[in-house]
From Swiss-Prot:
Peptide chain release factor 1 directs the termination of translation in response to the peptide chain termination codons UAG and UAA. The modification N5-methylglutamine is found at Q233. GO terms for cellular component: cytoplasm. PANTHER family: LD18447P (PTHR43804:SF7). This is Peptide chain release factor 1. InterPro entries: PCRF, Pep_chain_release_fac_I, Pep_chain_release_fac_I_sf, Prokaryotic/Mito_RF, RF-1. It comes from Syntrophus aciditrophicus (strain SB). Belongs to the prokaryotic/mitochondrial release factor family.
Amino acid sequence: MFSKLKEVESRYLELEKLLSDPTVVTRQSLYQKYAKEHADLRDLVEVFRKYEKVGAAIEEAQQLLRGDDEELKEIAREELPELRQHLAGLEERLKVLLLPRDLNDDRNVFLEIRAGTGGDEAGLFVGDLFRMYARYAEMRRWKVEVISSTPSSGVGGFKEIIASIAGQGAYSQLKYESGVHRVQRVPVTEAQGRIHTSAVTVAIMPEADEVEVTIDPNDLRIDVFHSSGHGGQSVNTTDSAVRITHLPTGLVVSCQDEKSQLKNKAKALKVLRARLLDIMVKKQSDEISEARKSQVGSGDRSERIRTYNFPQGRVTDHRVGLTLYSLENILGGDIQEFIDALTAYFQAESLKQQSTG
């Protein structure tokens, strides 16, 4: 591990020289490439340098223990346990930073939220979750744009909402939100006060570049239709809404939020490209079977990653066993504690796989 860290530090120093080289500065694309690599290595190099500094302090304390000065020996005895603990923490941090980086972490994302089991309640919770993610994005100063929304009949909920979220590190922060989110609450229409359980599926997909995912126009069937709002009423009189079917995979994407057919088509193609990239990534991870379903599940209540219990004001993430009694704040976008816990959990899992592999 430490020979690898020395190599990384050497490369970091080399990049610092390159970034001050006038011949590099004048070549914008090359400069940006080196600047990004330099930024990617910064955390690792800084932690490694702290590790070396603490290691040197431990060596110095051990030398004092071998000396004759009792006062200095006492100081060294007091400092050593804390220094060793600090060193162990830095070593664990280095192991995490050396893990293979997810190349999608810096990408923008598409967020898909769909109603599963639970009827009207599931549709209402689609809206609740969308507002939660939109508020979280707002806190991060990310940009949220609704690509498509399909209202459900009756109570003002949604069958589906698709949105793009653009901002630094969007995928790295949101990628573990994919799965089934379960809600337990008493519906407004429930006269007996019984708690109902509903489910909503969330999918987080990294945005794909056109170069990465090329789509043959001959593989597409494009249909146009009238946009409709709640209850099916027409919201404009032209065929501006677009439905694109990718014939080889059967994937279907609809977009009707823009008044322009061309804009709706462009947005739908972006979502389709992200879905196709999502499938490609899963194939590379040996998760070929039912690629979309493997991320979000079927929408059945039993396949849950997180439960939102309204009567108790409780939210539990079942993957990490974390329960927070701050439902209102969480639905208001305060989800960072879950995100940090999930990131640490999956990093630990990756470390386990490396040590056993």
